[in-house]
């Protein structure tokens, strides 16, 4: 096989990954995302929901979920990752405003702490409705915390 053709399988995978990233980028720019709510129950009383974990889902143009495993590691350290965190926070806080007894955990990257638009979303909602802070749980991914521990320490102090 001529060297310039490369490995066909590797080329197909790279092409698929590029197409997936472009779909994610387009979906995020159009805010074509939704939250999936995973209940977290109490150990003492498994029939009682303690809170919900709000998981962001990016939708393609046919409204199907693009599996996060296909893009998350590539975007974690990019602006696109920060934009997804902003959308998750905005959608989660909006749901909490609409449902006053809703307690949510929202996943995020530690890098989003230093991302001005993310902090603006958080501050805008908390300034309008301070009780949201009592019901909001921010779940910072372990991998991102290990990469920028100083940001997390400053945010939590």
Outline where the language-model segments fall.
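Short amphipathic alpha-helical segments and helix-helix/interface helices
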Residues: 25, 123, 152-157
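Active-site core of bacterial EAL-family cyclic-dinucleotide phosphodiesterase domains
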Residues: 6-72
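Residues at alpha-helix boundaries and the short loops/turns that link adjacent helices
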Residues: 27, 62-65, 78, 82-83, ...
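Signal-transducing alpha-helical linker
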Residues: 9-12, 16-19, 76, 80-85, ...
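Catalytic core of bacterial c-di-GMP phosphodiesterases, primarily the EAL and HD-GYP domains
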Residues: 48-53, 80-151
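Flexible, glycine/charge-rich interdomain/linker segments that couple
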Residues: 1-18, 101-110
């Amino acid at each position: 096989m001529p060297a310039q053709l490369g490995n066909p399988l590797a080329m197909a995978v790279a092409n698929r990954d590029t197409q997936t990233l472009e779909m994610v980028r387009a979906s995020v720019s159009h805010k074509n995302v939704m939250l999936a709510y995973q209940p977290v129950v109490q150990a003492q009383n498994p029939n009682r929901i303690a809170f919900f974990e709000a998981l962001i889902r990016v939708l393609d143009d046919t409204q199907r979920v693009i599996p996060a495993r296909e893009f998350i590691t590539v975007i974690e350290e990019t602006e696109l990752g920060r934009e997804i965190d902003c959308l998750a926070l905005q959608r989660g806080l909006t749901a909490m405003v609409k449902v006053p007894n809703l307690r949510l955990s929202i996943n995020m990257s530690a890098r989003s702490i230093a991302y001005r638009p993310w902090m603006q979303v958080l501050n805008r909602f908390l300034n309008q409705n301070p009780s949201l802070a009592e019901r909001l749980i921010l779940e910072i991914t372990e991998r991102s915390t290990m990469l920028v521990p100083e940001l997390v320490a400053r945010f939590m102090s």
